[in-house]
Amino acid sequence: IQPVKITNYTQIFRNTWAVSESTRATLTIAGDTNVAESRTDCAAFHAVDIEKALFFGQKSTGSRNGQPFRTMDGFQSIVSNLTYYPSSYAVANVTTAGSTTSYTQLEAALDPLFNQATDPKVGNERMLFVGGTARKVINAIGRLNGTYMMVDGQTSYGLQFQTFKISRGTFKVIEHPLFNSNSTWSKMAMALDLSTFSIAYLGDRKTRHDAFGAGNAGDNGYDAQGGTLTSELTCLIKNPPANGIIYNLTAGVAG
Protein backbone atom coordinates (compact mmCIF):
# COMPACT_ATOMS: atom_id res chain seq x y z
CA ILE A 1 0.00 0.00 0.00
CA GLN A 2 1.37 3.39 -0.98
CA PRO A 3 0.16 6.03 1.51
CA VAL A 4 -0.77 9.45 0.15
CA LYS A 5 -1.13 12.47 2.44
CA ILE A 6 -4.25 14.58 1.85
CA THR A 7 -4.54 17.93 3.64
CA ASN A 8 -7.50 20.24 4.05
CA TYR A 9 -8.66 23.18 6.15
CA THR A 10 -11.72 23.37 8.34
CA GLN A 11 -14.27 26.01 7.38
CA ILE A 12 -16.65 27.93 9.66
CA PHE A 13 -20.25 28.25 8.53
CA ARG A 14 -22.53 30.82 10.21
CA ASN A 15 -26.12 31.74 9.41
CA THR A 16 -28.35 34.03 11.47
CA TRP A 17 -32.12 34.44 11.64
CA ALA A 18 -34.14 37.13 13.43
CA VAL A 19 -37.67 38.52 13.61
CA SER A 20 -38.91 41.55 15.48
CA GLU A 21 -41.33 41.06 18.38
CA SER A 22 -44.00 42.76 16.26
CA THR A 23 -43.48 40.17 13.52
CA ARG A 24 -43.47 37.37 16.09
CA ALA A 25 -46.83 38.53 17.46
CA THR A 26 -48.41 38.80 14.01
CA LEU A 27 -50.60 35.80 13.22
CA THR A 28 -50.13 34.02 9.91
CA ILE A 29 -53.03 32.89 7.75
CA ALA A 30 -51.44 29.52 7.01
CA GLY A 31 -48.26 27.62 7.77
CA ASP A 32 -45.91 27.92 10.72
CA THR A 33 -45.43 30.96 12.90
CA ASN A 34 -43.08 33.69 11.69
CA VAL A 35 -40.49 32.58 14.25
CA ALA A 36 -40.65 28.94 13.13
CA GLU A 37 -40.45 29.83 9.44
CA SER A 38 -37.48 32.14 9.91
CA ARG A 39 -35.66 29.54 11.98
CA THR A 40 -36.41 26.81 9.42
CA ASP A 41 -35.22 28.99 6.53
CA CYS A 42 -31.99 29.70 8.38
CA ALA A 43 -31.38 25.97 8.89
CA ALA A 44 -31.99 25.36 5.18
CA PHE A 45 -29.53 28.11 4.16
CA HIS A 46 -26.96 26.69 6.60
CA ALA A 47 -27.32 23.21 5.09
CA VAL A 48 -27.05 24.53 1.52
CA ASP A 49 -23.88 26.50 2.34
CA ILE A 50 -22.27 23.39 3.82
CA GLU A 51 -23.38 21.13 0.98
CA LYS A 52 -22.15 23.55 -1.69
CA ALA A 53 -18.73 23.67 -0.02
CA LEU A 54 -18.62 19.86 0.28
CA PHE A 55 -19.09 19.57 -3.48
CA PHE A 56 -17.41 22.67 -4.89
CA GLY A 57 -15.26 24.25 -2.15
CA GLN A 58 -11.71 25.45 -2.89
CA LYS A 59 -9.05 25.55 -0.19
CA SER A 60 -7.83 29.02 0.76
CA THR A 61 -6.60 30.97 3.75
CA GLY A 62 -6.64 34.70 4.44
CA SER A 63 -8.05 37.21 6.89
CA ARG A 64 -11.24 39.21 7.37
CA ASN A 65 -11.54 42.06 9.84
CA GLY A 66 -8.13 41.12 11.18
CA GLN A 67 -9.16 37.52 11.90
CA PRO A 68 -7.99 34.36 10.10
CA PHE A 69 -10.38 33.09 7.45
CA ARG A 70 -10.20 29.64 5.84
CA THR A 71 -12.15 27.71 3.23
CA MET A 72 -11.92 24.01 2.54
CA ASP A 73 -11.42 21.86 -0.53
CA GLY A 74 -14.58 20.06 -1.58
CA PHE A 75 -15.10 16.87 -3.55
CA GLN A 76 -14.38 18.51 -6.91
CA SER A 77 -11.02 19.97 -5.87
CA ILE A 78 -9.83 16.86 -4.05
CA VAL A 79 -10.73 14.36 -6.77
CA SER A 80 -9.22 16.63 -9.47
CA ASN A 81 -5.87 16.89 -7.66
CA LEU A 82 -3.45 14.34 -9.16
CA THR A 83 -1.04 14.71 -6.22
CA TYR A 84 -3.62 12.87 -4.11
CA TYR A 85 -3.36 9.82 -6.39
CA PRO A 86 -0.78 7.00 -6.32
CA SER A 87 2.23 7.55 -8.57
CA SER A 88 0.93 4.92 -11.00
CA TYR A 89 -1.83 7.32 -12.11
CA ALA A 90 -0.96 9.57 -15.06
CA VAL A 91 -4.21 11.57 -14.86
CA ALA A 92 -6.95 12.16 -12.32
CA ASN A 93 -10.37 10.53 -12.73
CA VAL A 94 -11.77 13.60 -14.48
CA THR A 95 -13.29 13.51 -17.97
CA THR A 96 -14.70 16.27 -20.17
CA ALA A 97 -17.31 14.82 -22.50
CA GLY A 98 -17.60 15.83 -26.12
CA SER A 99 -20.68 17.15 -27.86
CA THR A 100 -22.19 13.65 -27.66
CA THR A 101 -21.60 10.72 -25.31
CA SER A 102 -22.15 7.03 -26.02
CA TYR A 103 -22.35 4.14 -23.57
CA THR A 104 -18.83 3.10 -24.60
CA GLN A 105 -17.49 6.57 -23.79
CA LEU A 106 -19.41 6.70 -20.51
CA GLU A 107 -17.93 3.36 -19.45
CA ALA A 108 -14.42 4.49 -20.41
CA ALA A 109 -14.79 7.58 -18.20
CA LEU A 110 -16.08 5.65 -15.19
CA ASP A 111 -14.10 2.40 -15.40
CA PRO A 112 -10.92 3.69 -13.63
CA LEU A 113 -12.94 4.32 -10.44
CA PHE A 114 -12.97 0.58 -9.80
CA ASN A 115 -9.20 0.20 -9.82
CA GLN A 116 -9.38 1.14 -6.13
CA ALA A 117 -11.29 -0.79 -3.45
CA THR A 118 -11.80 1.26 -0.29
CA ASP A 119 -13.89 -1.14 1.76
CA PRO A 120 -13.84 -4.87 0.86
CA LYS A 121 -17.23 -5.28 2.56
CA VAL A 122 -18.83 -2.89 0.06
CA GLY A 123 -19.53 -3.95 -3.52
CA ASN A 124 -18.47 -2.01 -6.58
CA GLU A 125 -21.18 0.62 -6.28
CA ARG A 126 -21.03 4.40 -6.58
CA MET A 127 -23.50 7.23 -6.07
CA LEU A 128 -23.66 9.40 -9.19
CA PHE A 129 -24.76 12.95 -8.35
CA VAL A 130 -25.86 14.73 -11.51
CA GLY A 131 -27.53 17.86 -12.81
CA GLY A 132 -30.68 17.81 -14.91
CA THR A 133 -28.88 17.88 -18.27
CA ALA A 134 -26.48 15.10 -17.27
CA ARG A 135 -29.39 12.98 -16.09
CA LYS A 136 -31.16 13.38 -19.43
CA VAL A 137 -27.96 12.37 -21.24
CA ILE A 138 -27.60 9.20 -19.16
CA ASN A 139 -31.28 8.41 -19.71
CA ALA A 140 -30.90 8.97 -23.46
CA ILE A 141 -27.89 6.63 -23.60
CA GLY A 142 -29.98 3.87 -22.04
CA ARG A 143 -32.98 4.57 -24.25
CA LEU A 144 -31.00 4.73 -27.50
CA ASN A 145 -29.07 1.55 -26.76
CA GLY A 146 -32.16 -0.57 -26.15
CA THR A 147 -35.66 -1.24 -27.40
CA TYR A 148 -39.05 -0.95 -25.76
CA MET A 149 -42.57 -1.67 -26.89
CA MET A 150 -45.91 0.07 -26.48
CA VAL A 151 -49.19 -1.80 -26.71
CA ASP A 152 -52.80 -0.82 -27.32
CA GLY A 153 -54.47 0.53 -24.19
CA GLN A 154 -51.25 1.77 -22.62
CA THR A 155 -51.82 4.97 -20.63
CA SER A 156 -48.23 5.96 -19.91
CA TYR A 157 -44.94 5.71 -21.71
CA GLY A 158 -41.29 6.65 -21.40
CA LEU A 159 -38.18 5.44 -19.63
CA GLN A 160 -36.61 6.74 -16.45
CA PHE A 161 -33.42 5.02 -15.31
CA GLN A 162 -32.36 5.30 -11.65
CA THR A 163 -29.47 2.83 -11.91
CA PHE A 164 -27.10 1.72 -14.64
CA LYS A 165 -24.26 -0.76 -14.83
CA ILE A 166 -20.93 -0.95 -16.57
CA SER A 167 -18.69 -4.01 -16.75
CA ARG A 168 -17.10 -3.50 -13.34
CA GLY A 169 -19.65 -1.67 -11.23
CA THR A 170 -23.04 -0.12 -10.61
CA PHE A 171 -24.09 3.53 -10.38
CA LYS A 172 -27.15 4.89 -8.61
CA VAL A 173 -28.17 8.16 -10.27
CA ILE A 174 -29.28 11.02 -8.00
CA GLU A 175 -30.26 14.38 -9.47
CA HIS A 176 -29.09 17.02 -7.01
CA PRO A 177 -30.97 20.37 -7.00
CA LEU A 178 -27.75 22.25 -6.30
CA PHE A 179 -26.34 21.11 -9.64
CA ASN A 180 -29.23 22.78 -11.47
CA SER A 181 -28.30 26.27 -10.26
CA ASN A 182 -26.31 26.95 -13.45
CA SER A 183 -25.81 25.41 -16.88
CA THR A 184 -22.24 24.23 -16.23
CA TRP A 185 -23.08 22.25 -13.10
CA SER A 186 -26.21 20.90 -14.79
CA LYS A 187 -23.96 19.00 -17.21
CA MET A 188 -21.79 17.52 -14.45
CA ALA A 189 -21.74 14.06 -12.92
CA MET A 190 -19.85 13.31 -9.70
CA ALA A 191 -19.30 9.63 -8.91
CA LEU A 192 -18.88 9.18 -5.16
CA ASP A 193 -17.72 6.12 -3.26
CA LEU A 194 -19.60 6.66 0.00
CA SER A 195 -17.12 4.56 1.97
CA THR A 196 -14.41 7.15 1.16
CA PHE A 197 -16.41 10.20 2.22
CA SER A 198 -17.10 11.71 5.62
CA ILE A 199 -17.59 15.09 7.27
CA ALA A 200 -14.88 15.84 9.83
CA TYR A 201 -15.88 18.33 12.52
CA LEU A 202 -13.25 20.24 14.48
CA GLY A 203 -13.56 18.75 17.96
CA ASP A 204 -17.01 19.49 19.33
CA ARG A 205 -17.77 22.11 16.66
CA LYS A 206 -20.84 20.35 15.30
CA THR A 207 -23.80 22.54 14.41
CA ARG A 208 -24.74 24.74 17.39
CA HIS A 209 -27.68 27.10 17.74
CA ASP A 210 -27.19 30.22 19.89
CA ALA A 211 -30.50 32.01 20.52
CA PHE A 212 -31.19 35.57 21.60
CA GLY A 213 -34.38 37.27 22.66
CA ALA A 214 -37.37 35.33 24.00
CA GLY A 215 -36.31 36.10 27.56
CA ASN A 216 -32.81 34.62 27.36
CA ALA A 217 -30.35 35.94 29.89
CA GLY A 218 -28.13 38.76 28.64
CA ASP A 219 -30.50 39.88 25.91
CA ASN A 220 -30.23 43.56 26.96
CA GLY A 221 -33.81 44.36 26.10
CA TYR A 222 -33.81 43.18 22.47
CA ASP A 223 -37.17 43.77 20.83
CA ALA A 224 -36.59 40.71 18.66
CA GLN A 225 -35.99 36.99 18.62
CA GLY A 226 -33.33 35.20 16.65
CA GLY A 227 -30.37 32.93 16.67
CA THR A 228 -27.18 31.89 14.93
CA LEU A 229 -26.21 28.48 13.58
CA THR A 230 -22.47 27.77 13.65
CA SER A 231 -20.56 24.75 12.35
CA GLU A 232 -16.85 24.13 11.73
CA LEU A 233 -15.94 21.18 9.56
CA THR A 234 -14.06 19.91 6.55
CA CYS A 235 -14.60 17.52 3.66
CA LEU A 236 -12.75 14.23 4.12
CA ILE A 237 -12.12 12.03 1.07
CA LYS A 238 -9.97 9.09 2.18
CA ASN A 239 -9.38 7.57 -1.26
CA PRO A 240 -9.78 10.08 -4.13
CA PRO A 241 -8.98 7.58 -6.94
CA ALA A 242 -12.14 5.63 -6.08
CA ASN A 243 -14.17 8.67 -7.15
CA GLY A 244 -14.56 10.57 -10.40
CA ILE A 245 -16.05 13.54 -12.25
CA ILE A 246 -17.48 13.99 -15.74
CA TYR A 247 -17.99 17.47 -17.17
CA ASN A 248 -20.04 18.71 -20.12
CA LEU A 249 -22.52 15.86 -20.59
CA THR A 250 -24.53 17.40 -23.43
CA ALA A 251 -26.29 14.73 -25.50
CA GLY A 252 -26.53 10.95 -25.52
CA VAL A 253 -26.08 8.74 -28.60
CA ALA A 254 -26.18 5.01 -29.33
CA GLY A 255 -22.91 3.17 -29.25
Regions found by a protein language model. Give the residues of each.
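Core alpha/beta structural scaffold of self-assembling particle/tube/pore-forming proteins
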Residues: 1-255
